[in-house]
Structures are given as C-alpha cells and as structure tokens.
Amino acid sequence: MSTRISRSVYADMFGPTTGDRVRLADTDLIIEVEKDLTTYGEEVKFGGGKVIRDGMGQSQVTNKDGAADTVITNALIVDHWGIVKADVAITAGVITAIGKAGNPDVQPNVDIIIGPGTDVIAGEGKILTAGGFDSHIHFICPQQIEHALMSGVTTMLGGGTGPSHGTFATTCTPGPWHIGRMIQSFDAFPVNLGISGKGNAALPGPLKEMIEGGACALKLHEDWGTTPAAIDNCLTVADAYDIQVMIHTDTLNESGFVEDTVKAFKGRTIHAFHTEGAGGGHAPDIIKVASLENVLPSSTNPTRPFTRNTIDEHLDMLMVCHHLDPSIAEDLAFAESRIRKETIAAEDILHDLGALSMMSSDSQAMGRLGEVIIRTWQTADKMKKQRGALPQDSARNDNFRVKRYIAKYTINPAIAHGVSKLIGSVETGKMADLVLWSPAFFGVKPDCIIKGGSIVAAPMGDPNASIPTPQPVHYQPMFGAYGKALTASSVVFTSQAAAAGNLARDLGIAKKLVPVSNVRGGISKKSMIHNDATPKLEVDPETYEVRADGELLTCAPAEVLPLAQRYFMF
C-alpha cells in the first residue's frame, strides 16, 4: 500500500524534489529543483533497515555485467545544464549514468544497476557539482594543491617552477627542461594539472620546443614583454599546435595601447586574464576587450566582489608580486595605475551580465587559490542584492543566475582550454570529478571531493575515535590520494604534439597525458555557456567610468559578505 507524506518529511528523508527550493549557504541565492529523475516510492537509500540490501534495492548483477562501481543516491545536481535531483552512477572513474538507481529485478524504471560490487555515497539533502577548474595558477609552492583541492577545485592549469621571482610574478614555465621537471612532480598530486609555457618570444622556435616539451598552453605576460610582435608570434604558433594562449597585457602602454594589442590578435581566439585590469593590463581600459567575439575573458579573485577593503589591500599585494620598490616613484605610479574602483565595480556587473566568462585565482600572486568558488558566489550574491533578479529568473528562484555563475569555474574554463570532453560538468562520459556539499556550507566547505571516481579528500574527525565525527575535524587526503590510485584517477593535460610523442616514457611519469584540442578557431566568446555577452564597452580615460552599450556600470562596494567569517570561526 502507498503512504502519503509531507514535502518536508520527504525532503528530510530523500532530499528535495521537483518544486522544492534550497538556499545556498548564507547567501540570498535560492535554487528550485527543476526535475526529479528518481521514482517516488522506489527511491534507494543506504543504511540499516533501508532499501539498498540484498534482494531489495541491491541486485545480483556483477560489475562486469553492468552494475555500477559507485552510486551517489538522491543528489541535487547543480550544473550549467540544470538543477536536477537524480542518482549518479560512476564506473571505472567515469560518470556513466544520471537517473534512477536500484534493482531492475524488483523495481521499475531502473537505469542504474546496484549490485554486490557497488559502493554508495549518500547524496540525500546534498548538492552535487562538478569539480572546479582554476586556470590561472602560479605554481609557487606544491602546498597550494592541497588547499585548492579541499576547496572543491580538481583541475589546475598554470605556470611556474616554484618560488622563483619569475614564478612570483608570471604564470609561465620557461623552456622544456623546467616543463619536464614540473610534469614529473605532478605524479604526487591527486588533481588534473596542466602547464603553460612562456609565450613571450618574437620567433617561433622557443615556443615550439615548449609545446613539444609538454606545455598545454602558452602565457604572454607583461613582465616578460607582451609586445605586438610577441602576441602575433605566440598566436601563430598556438594556431599550428591547437593550444590556448592566455594574456596579461602591457599596463604601462609602452609597446602600444589596448587597440594595438587587439590589432595583434588579428581576430584569433585568446584567453584574457584579469580582464578588469587590477591584476595587470593596459591601464585604464583593458576591460574593453570583454566586448570582443574572439576574447575569452576571465577574472582573478582578489577583486571579486568589490568591497570596502578591495582597494586598500591591492596596492601592497601588487608591490610584492611584481618585485616593485615603493621608494621608487615610477614603481609606485605603476602600481597605482592598476587599481581603479570604477573598473572593479564595473567588473561585478559585467559578471552578472555574462560578459565576463570565467573565474580564477592568480594563486599567491594577487589571488587566493582556495577562494575561487567562495568569491564566485559572493559576487553572485552581491549582484542579487544590488541588482535584483535577472530577467531570466523569477520571483521564486535564481536558477539562471546560479547556472551562469557555476559555469564560470567549471565548464567554461574547460571549454577555453580544450578539455570539456573530459571534465567541467556533471554529464555522462566525463571523468567523475565531483564535489558533494551540504546546502548550508555550499561554496565554502565541501562534504566530499571525488576525483576520477575515488574519494580523494573529505573532512574527517579523530582517526582514533570510535566513530568518524568527533572533533577535531580537519580536511584530510583520503585513499584516492595515495599510491597508484592517485596517478590512476588524475591526468596531465598537454599538447597533442607532446602526447603523440614519447614524452611520458622519457619523463618516466605514471599519470596519463591527455591532449587538449579545439581551442583555436573552433571556439569563441559564443562558446562560453551562459557567459557570452559582448556589449560595447567604453572607458573614460579621465574618470575611469565604464559604460556598456552606453549605460554607466557602477555599484557600491559591499560592507558585509556571505560565505565569510561565520564559516571560519574554527
């Protein structure tokens, strides 16, 4: 016989269903479940006296014959494509199904088979997202990677060689020897990693050897001389090898203005870092490149969102990161030219309009790599408070705004860097790089981080306790982060030229080399999901005011933010 229960009781037992709404942490962002792929009355749940037991929700099917390795039950998926309740199957480290799990011998509508060889992760009342992708990493110290992972980031792309002065300032790994050494070190870390080589050269030879040596991208940085000649040469070589180019333009306008840089692009696709300009770039109007079809614009997180403290902290950060001397007037003027409250305020709004497509950190080099996800949602919340609902949303929910913002650190950087077939979203056929969150801690502190189908990190209580929850609770690496499980569940992204050669053998690495692809003519700003707007942008050279299609973009700095001190008292 059937039994009718209230929505609140159902949500407590199996998680929210269609029409239920969930607040994201302490923000004003509300999501509403669009669809429930499970079957009422046939839900699967693990535990004593629950459904997933032999002959009930668990079948006799072997893994060889189709039972999943792992099932995440009754999770609320939040992704660019939807906000959907479902069971999620993982097999051989890959997401193989999103739908209804159970035992097809006794249950209807089952498309995910639970067998004796299936493990269960309880997703009831939890939010499931794709692992984050931080595409602006200064590899200054290896300890960064653990901090990023514990925040929900599972893929990192950038450059550097450790705490050298070149790495403090620029995301470039120079030359094939350094690239090789960095890739060899990557076997120690349970995340996907990629190296950007130095793109500043006026002739192709040095760039080609870095690409063939394992770089998956090239980075043009003003501290190495981002001249029109270097830009043109770098993009020409990148076109030949199908890799992405990232650019930090000329703050001092020594070799040209923003118009000269755009001319050097020649309409070719390029990823523009910290497009607002506080992180570097043509002062005061680099932000204008966000209006171009061929530019994939991103932000770094220290300016996200604009608060009453943003301006004050930036000057000191900049002096340290770019090896400047405050006693030299020219160095001080260089620093001050980059920090403009008007363009930082406009950056908030351009994110909300979908004109700035991606979010990243700029780790330890004017950015906090453990806060990419936090600051994305702080920006979304600030814009909800200041600008109200987006036209695509209703009074009931902020679903479209949430989809827009989550795309900024998941699918869009994956598209920009040619790896979206493998990572970047919760979709079948992709690597199971997943993060499970309690709604009250969404965006701040994950419940569980899954990498390539294995749990690699989670908050864990005293290992000597009788149960897993007693204090002190710390984020800790799990079994998936050790031994050969680590190298089997994560990859190194590289160029097609490097992957096709003998690089893995020559370097003696265990991780699989995965080539990037389709990052040149095949993509443009239109490829940036929910973030493809190209308004005409103008910057007043005297006041620094920014206008989009003639409308002044301005907003007040935030006095208080969500996802902040109340979550970090201990």
From Swiss-Prot:
CC annotations in GO: cytoplasm
Keyword Methyltransferase found: no
Nucleotidyltransferase in keyword set: no
Predominant place of localization: cytoplasm
Active site positions, chain numbering: 322
Subcellular location: Cytoplasm
InterPro entries the UniProt entry points to: Amidohydro-rel (IPR006680), Metal-dep_hydrolase_composite (IPR011059), Metal_Hydrolase (IPR032466), Urease_alpha_N_dom (IPR011612), Urease_alpha_subunit (IPR050112), Urease_AS (IPR017950), Urease_asu (IPR005848), Urease_asu_c (IPR017951)
Pathway involvement of the protein, from the record: Nitrogen metabolism; urea degradation; CO(2) and NH(3) from urea (urease route): step 1/1
Reaction catalysis annotation: urea + 2 H2O + H(+) = hydrogencarbonate + 2 NH4(+)
Residues the record lists as binding substrate: 221
Residues annotated as binding Ni(2+) 2: 219, 248, 274
Annotated binding of Ni(2+) 1, by residue: 136, 138, 219, 362
Subunit architecture: Heterotrimer of UreA (gamma), UreB (beta) and UreC (alpha) subunits. Three heterotrimers associate to form the active enzyme.
Family: Belongs to the metallo-dependent hydrolases superfamily. Urease alpha subunit family.
Protein's name according to its UniProt entry: Urease subunit alpha
Gene: ureC
